[in-house]
Amino acid sequence: MPNKVYDVTIIGGGPIGLFSAFYSGLRSMKTKIIDAEPAVGGKVRYFFPEKIIRDIGGIPAITGENLVANLKQQAETFHPTIVCSERVVDVTKLSDGTFQLTSHNGSIHFSKTIVIATGSGTFEVNKLEALHAEDFPFAIHYDVKNIEQFRDKVVVVSGGGNSAIDWAQTLEPIAKQVHLIYRGEDFKAHEESVRELQNSRVEIHIHHEINELIGTNNQLTKINVCCNKTQATKTIQTDALFINHGVKVDLGTMAEWGFEQADFGIVVDDEMKTTVPGIFACGDSATYPRKIRIIAAGLHEGPIAINSAKKYLEPTAADEAMISTHHESFIG
């Protein structure tokens, strides 16, 4: 077993997990990433490949796809082992203190420490299952790989959170017309995003819900929407419909792993330690007072978790890694 034991195993290969792997390399830790999805990148890869991300210092704007590509390239600097399509379902601490991680397919992994960076958990988008949505499989979208397919099209976006507003704004300069349908009034999104939306060409329909999809031969041509305050209806011509109604989050068996959890994640202290010695958490997996849930904050928490894991293994180790500009791997 010794040659199979890693210093740290990072569960979750999203942006925070990838950057944590890079930082663990700076700390000379033998590192493994295990991700439940077929490829690393997390929700950013799945939901935001062509969306513009603006909440990372020093990067005014970057697509999700490019951000993930950069983070993956950076993570591979120190050659971590990356395992995809495996969902960790059980963690057991052995008599020698090593953790045994069991995946859903029966694979076994061994690690001296664990960093949980699974975000909110594994996820599945909430799909539109009524209104005969199955009749329009190519016109109803939950994520987009190629935004150019909507150039000069009329597009409807349904939802009122950050994702819906981001998509409406991303599509606005590409599409002929963008409509945003929201059943509420106060958008659940960043204030500046809402302000930009209100100053854009996007036609906003608050207090409205979709009540009928109309088209032929699997081609959506229009939707009917109803005002939930007045019951008045109207018809909107459209070529495509985006559904942004949130996701179903599955924390799987984590609740059985022994650490304290709260409503918004795994409880950690200021060193990203969970209540189980040797297990740490960061990013959207973790919660603590005054938590800020943006990518930039998670990129800060990941190195804290790795430093804590390093100190757990070697109490006399330095508190933090030498800055990368002075690291031997980047000199010469």
From Swiss-Prot:
* Keyword field: FAD, Flavoprotein, NADP, Oxidoreductase
One Pfam match: Pyr_redox_2
Q: Which domain of life is it from?
A: Bacteria
- Reaction equation(s) it catalyzes: 2 reduced [2Fe-2S]-[ferredoxin] + NADP(+) + H(+) = 2 oxidized [2Fe-2S]-[ferredoxin] + NADPH
Which protein family is it in? Belongs to the ferredoxin--NADP reductase type 2 family.
Binding-site list for FAD: 35, 43, 48, 88, 123, 284, 325
Enzyme Commission code(s) on record: 1.18.1.2
Q: Which InterPro entries match?
A: FAD/NAD-bd_sf (IPR036188), FAD/NAD-binding_dom (IPR023753), Fd--NADP_Rdtase_type_2 (IPR022890), Ferredoxin-NADP_redctase_2 (IPR050097)
User: What is said about its interaction partners and assembly?
Assistant: Homodimer.
Cofactor dependency: FAD
State the species of origin: Listeria monocytogenes serotype 4b (strain F2365)
User: What protein am I looking at?
Assistant: Ferredoxin--NADP reductase 1
- Molecular function per GO: ferredoxin-NADP+ reductase activity; flavin adenine dinucleotide binding; NADP binding
Top EC category: oxidoreductase
Q: Write the signal peptide boundaries.
A: none
Q: Which Gene3D superfamilies match?
A: FAD/NAD(P)-binding domain
The annotation note on the cofactor reads: Binds 1 FAD per subunit.
